[in-house]
Swiss-Prot record:
Name of the protein: Cytochrome P450 monooxygenase 98
MF terms (GO), sorted A to Z: heme binding; iron ion binding; monooxygenase activity; oxidoreductase activity, acting on paired donors, with incorporation or reduction of molecular oxygen
Name of encoding gene: CYP098
Signal peptide boundaries: none
Enzyme Commission (EC) number: 1.-.-.-
Broad class of the protein's primary localization: membrane
Pathway: Secondary metabolite biosynthesis
Transmembrane segments: 7-27
Length: 520
């Protein structure tokens, strides 16, 4: 009898196993029969390689979305499957609700392998290294402890105010300097002039990262076999470029980290991401390995934070030059709230809703990361009758989301009032652009609260002290900025350099600015 039962059980297992295999085969075949999402016509072998937009790709993707009547479009670049999501609803469904399979990162040959950014937090696949660095971020930059960094943000912003007063402003140089000393202090605890030796290298390294991080920027990303070409081969100039950019990355990662450790050892340090993380290391685990993780988290913090705030504040200045009435309205509210001789502080946020609305519109109108950083689909999936192949690069079109007429009526004009109620208070029913400005799903930027508050305090402080005016030529005529934006492949959307003037609003404002020299 027991033998008979065993035979029945074995037969039952065989039947169940066979049934499961059949179901799997049927499901796989049904997936294979499902169509890919719509998109431009694909050519043999190269797919849409010739259709890929070289710059401002988010505009083309939004155009294709309208042309094909679909929130999701599909492209193929020499065999690489690319999915572009063009609505908040679809991004929420896939990147949020199905984040388990949509949270990894596509590995770009140029950026990750040749330039060495593969283990950087923002670019790493979902693996133990990424999880460990995420834990470092969450502990060291916890939003509940945001006030710990307010002093650093105010110090850097006050230095920016003083530097803008020194003479004809090279705005972009000053903004890069402001962002650098701010992020160096928050990340490494390196302050003021001590940060100067690291700034130039960091700016160059971040520029190279922004270029190489844009899908389609280098042919080697579509045809990885090209990475084996000797550097001297015609057409292999990208390898020399990658080698030079890799050196910049290493300098950017190593030098300030070593300096931060020296400060901590000597006891002459202020709280920072690095100091907080080093204090939290597990003494029973490999210390060298933990330090490498902290170093990787730190360089990512510097990279993501610096470019984000520079792009946003330069976009704010350009918007003010194009809309002087917005500047006047913001300054009227500042004058109502601030006492004589006062500069804005973080305690004034609730009292300055127009400044907050202005920052929201800066983030919405020309988002800093219009396509975020591409995700990777780690398993086959389906959506609305379409097959979404495993291994696809998945891009969320933040620009399209932030220009959705159903969410932001009449989205093209720059208009901070869209975020305000008739009584001048913030309209909480209008979706906050920050929800689409700092990544999606499990890849949401852990330092977004610091970036947002840094942008806010700089905007409020500049408007409290200065009138932003157009540059004048030798004949005294105003020079109207072109308002052009960088048109090449890039992760970060930023305006091209333009000239302007920062004129103190009054003698009292000028006195405040001059007094800041002794405090920075």
């Amino acid at each position: 009898m027991p033998t008979t039962l065993r035979m029945l059980n074995n037969n039952l297992l065989i039947v169940i196993g066979t049934f499961a295999v059949c179901v799997y085969i049927v499901l796989q075949r049904s997936k294979a029969r499902l169509p890919l999402p719509p998109g431009p016509r694909k050519w043999p072998l190269i797919g849409n390689l010739l259709d890929m937009p070289g710059g401002r790709a988010w505009l083309k993707y939004a155009e294709w979305s309208r042309e094909y009547g679909s929130d999701i479009i599909h492209l193929s670049a020499a065999g690489t499957s690319i999915l572009v999501l063009n609505s908040a609803e679809l991004v929420n469904e896939l990147m949020e609700k199905r984040s388990a399979i949509y949270s990894s990162r596509a590995q770009l040959t140029m950026l990750h392998e040749l330039m060495g950014w593969k283990d950087a937090f923002s670019f790493a696949p979902t693996n133990p290294t990424w999880r460990a660095q995420r834990k470092i971020f969450m502990q060291a930059l916890n939003p509940n402890n945001a006030a710990l960094f307010h002093g650093k943000q105010l110090r850097a912003t006050h230095e920016l105010l003083w530097r803008l007063h020194k003479g004809p402003a090279n705005l972009f140089h000053e903004l890069h300097h402001w962002a650098a000393i701010l992020i160096m202090d928050i990340t490494y605890g390196i302050r003021g002039d001590a940060a100067d030796p690291y700034i130039e290298t960091a700016v160059e390294a971040l520029d190279s990262m922004a270029i190489a991080g844009a899908p389609g920027a280098f042919l080697v990303d579509a045809v990885p076999l090209l990475r084996h070409m000797p550097e001297w081969t015609p057409g292999a100039g990208f390898k020399r470029q990658a080698r030079e950019w890799n050196v910049l990355r290493q300098k950017m990662a190593n030098r300030p980290f070593i300096a931060a450790k020296q400060q901590i050892t000597s006891g002459s340090y202020t709280p920072s991401l690095v100091s907080n993380a080093l204090e939290a290391v597990d003494k029973n685990q490999d210390l060298a390995e933990q330090e490498e993780l902290i170093k990787g988290a730190a360089v990512t913090s510097y990279g993501g934070g610096s470019d984000t705030v520079v792009a946003a504040v330069s976009a704010f200045v350009l918007a003010i030059l194009q809309h002087p009435e917005i500047q006047a309205k913001a300054q009227r509210q500042l004058d109502e709230v601030l006492g004589h001789g006062e500069l804005p502080s973080f305690q004034d946020v609730q009292s300055l809703p127009y400044i907050t609305a202005l920052v929201k519109e800066v983030l919405r109108h020309n988002p800093v990361t219009p396509l975020a950083i591409p995700h990777l689909l780690s398993e086959d999936d389906t959506w609305d009758g379409y097959w979404l192949p495993k291994g696809s690069i998945v891009m969320a079109n933040a620009w399209a989301i932030l220009h959705d007429e159903n969410t932001y009526p009449d989205p093209m004009p720059f208009n901070p009032d869209r975020f305000l109620r008739p009584d001048g208070k913030l309209d909480e029913t209008v979706k906050d652009p920050a929800t689409a400005s700092f990544g999606f799903g499990r890849r949401l930027c852990p330092g977004r609260h610091i970036a947002l508050s840094s942008i806010w305090i700089s905007v409020a402080s500049i408007l409290a002290c200065y009138v932003i005016r157009k540059e004048v030529d030798a004949a005294g005529r105003e020079v109207v900025p072109d308002g052009e934006w960088y048109g090449g492949p890039t992760l970060f959307n930023r305006p091209l350099p333009f000239k302007c003037r920062f004129t103190p609003r009054s003698k009292a404002a000028e006195a405040i600015i001059v007094s800041l020299e002794n405090t920075v």
